[in-house]
Amino acid sequence: MNTSTKSYRRTKYACYYTYLAMSSIFSLPPLLFNTFHDRYGISYTLLGTLVLINFCTQLTVDLIFTFFTKYFNPHKTLRMMPCLTTLGLLVYAAIPTLFPQMAYIGFVAGTVIFSIAAGLCEVFLSPTVAALPSEHPERDMSMLHSLYGWGVLTVVVISTAFLRIFGTEYWMILTAFWALLPIGSCVLFCTSPLPAMNLTAQSESAAHAKRQNLGLALCVVCIFLGSAAENAMTNWISGYMETALHLPKVVGDILGMAAFAMLLVTARMLYAKYGKNITTVLLYSMIGAVLCYLIAALSPWVAVSMIACVLTGFVTSMLWPGTLILMEEKIPNPGVTAYALMAAGGDCGASVAPQLLGIVTDNVAASTWASDLAVSLSLTPDEIGMKVGMITAAVFPMIGIGAILFIKRYFAKNS
């Protein structure tokens, strides 16, 4: 390890810790939705709208930094980001506690604030890690994204234990606790050297810039498809196991969601230690995702379907970070703008796929042909709908296989 690498070790750890601490933004609110419904009388529709607000805010931040990157100081923004997370979570907890009649306004305000921080996290943490001197930058990127999964598991376990031991009436104390963790990120970033980051890609000529832009567009398509393949199962694994496989909810949550997350984290850490040949990894990941979705939907054996659902976490684990690694390999010094655009593509995939799966499931379950098929197969229309939804989700990695093959040919031709 050279001197330059050593001097930035603290910076790398700051990025790792920040990704870990930021996971509370995504995993804590859903754990509290039932509490908010019972204590404040907020409908599930309005609570679900908070998830949409979270996504739309992050996407807005991604797009702002895609088109207006030059107006922002990346180092100041990076140091301010954890403070926004803390502020958002404190607002999320304080306004409903102090003004119960304004609870939903507090939840919306807090969600907007910490979602801005989440968007900034997506835009700036990856290029910061990529800009650090390293002997294995692709492994550092994989490790960064694996820590998000560990963060989710940690938040779920600690929060569930807290609410069970102390009661849901103290949810605001739990939220305040998670709000304190990002302060450590702020301290680390303020006391660590930050690398210079290109705001936009540097091109030698107009023709070269055109090739880079097309290559970046292909990477955005790839991360959209990869994110869709991962998040369709992430959002539906528990419901699918409960409705289509008739497993108890606790099994769907523990053996489903938790095992899915654990395999996702494990695969990313394995790549962080041993990884290479990212294009091949992405190709086999897409193929594996197609097989897992089809087996989960079509297998007549519950155990096989359950294993396929869980294994989706392993095979899709590298599709998001792996596409970032691919972009960094093929487009040197891509700039913060490129990372913002990639984050926007990933966020779109994370939103579109679960929504499409839900729409397909509802429409198929309500159809006449599904009712007739359900009778002949001794299933319910809802089961048929869920299985068709899973088959539909397999379309994303199917297209992804073609996209990866095209990307491989494109960069081989234009390298």
Q: Which residue ranges define each predicted feature?
A:
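Extracytoplasmic gate region of multi-pass secondary transporters
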Residues: 29-31, 212-266
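Helix-to-loop junctions at the C-terminal end of transmembrane segments
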Residues: 61-76, 163, 266-279, 361
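C-terminal ends and interior cores of transmembrane alpha-helices
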Residues: 83-101, 288-300
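Cytoplasmic helix-loop-helix junction between adjacent transmembrane helices
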Residues: 110-146
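Intracellular juxtamembrane helix-capping segments at the cytosolic ends
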Residues: 120-133, 318-332
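Helix-loop-helix hairpin linking two adjacent transmembrane segments in secondary transporters
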Residues: 135-136, 143-197
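Symmetry-related core transmembrane helices of the 12-TM Major Facilitator Superfamily/SLC fold
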Residues: 172-190, 387-406
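C-terminal transmembrane helical hairpin of 12-TM major facilitator-type secondary transporters
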Residues: 278-326
